[in-house]
């Protein structure tokens, strides 16, 4: 790997990358996360019997909100005008987990990878928050970028 860190300047200090001269292109990123839990906890979510309400709806909205607030959370991220944010949650009872997938899109000068990752991880954290009274040992895992399109570095897919 010969690439340099783009967020470190010649003096070794962190800085926000200057995207002034970059071209506006269509950009898209997808990310995923999993949250593992006891079968009883997952059943409570799936049946809608959780005392805090609809866990999936709340996690979906939290993920969307988080994508829009990424630059407030991660210091060197640019504020972006996202044109689409999607968060999908799928119960996987055979694995005692929820699979979370996110999609972020825009036409702009910088990518949306961090927004997609923030959406997926925040949705997982929201599920944890809503279910922690029932189960404290849930595990959030495999938060990762699964696909990226647009920009100079081109297409990436796991």
Curated annotation (Swiss-Prot):
UniProt pathway annotation: Cofactor biosynthesis; molybdopterin biosynthesis
Cystines in this chain: none
UniProt keyword list: Lyase, Molybdenum cofactor biosynthesis
Binding site for substrate: 76-78, 114-115
GO molecular function: cyclic pyranopterin monophosphate synthase activity; GTP 3',8'-cyclase activity
CDD domains named among the record's database cross-references: MoaC_PE
Active site: 129
Catalyzed reactions: (8S)-3',8-cyclo-7,8-dihydroguanosine 5'-triphosphate = cyclic pyranopterin phosphate + diphosphate
Top-level taxon: Bacteria
One GO process term, biological-process aspect: Mo-molybdopterin cofactor biosynthetic process
One Pfam family cited in the UniProt record for this chain: MoaC
EC annotation from Swiss-Prot or TrEMBL: 4.6.1.17
Oligomer status and interactors: Homohexamer; trimer of dimers.
Role description: Catalyzes the conversion of (8S)-3',8-cyclo-7,8-dihydroguanosine 5'-triphosphate to cyclic pyranopterin monophosphate (cPMP).
Similarity remark: Belongs to the MoaC family.
PANTHER family hit by this protein: MOLYBDENUM COFACTOR BIOSYNTHESIS PROTEIN 1, MOLYBDOPTERIN COFACTOR SYNTHESIS PROTEIN A
Identification of the protein by name: Cyclic pyranopterin monophosphate synthase
Organism: Shewanella halifaxensis (strain HAW-EB4)
């Amino acid at each position: 790997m010969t690439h340099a860190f783009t967020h470190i300047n010649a003096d070794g200090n962190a800085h926000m990358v200057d995207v002034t001269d970059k071209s506006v292109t269509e950009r898209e990123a997808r990310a995923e996360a999993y949250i593992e839990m006891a079968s009883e906890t997952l059943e409570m979510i799936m049946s809608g019997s959780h005392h805090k309400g609809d866990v999936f709806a709340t996690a979906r909205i939290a993920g969307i909100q988080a994508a829009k607030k990424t630059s407030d959370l991660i210091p060197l991220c640019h504020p972006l005008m996202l044109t689409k944010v999607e968060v999908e949650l799928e119960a996987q009872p055979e694995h005692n987990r929820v699979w979370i997938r996110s999609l972020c899109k825009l036409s702009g000068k910088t990518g949306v990878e961090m927004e997609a990752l923030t959406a997926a991880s925040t949705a997982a954290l929201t599920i944890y928050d809503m279910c922690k009274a029932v189960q404290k040992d849930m595990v959030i895992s495999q938060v990762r970028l699964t696909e990226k399109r647009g920009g100079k570095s081109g297409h990436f897919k796991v």
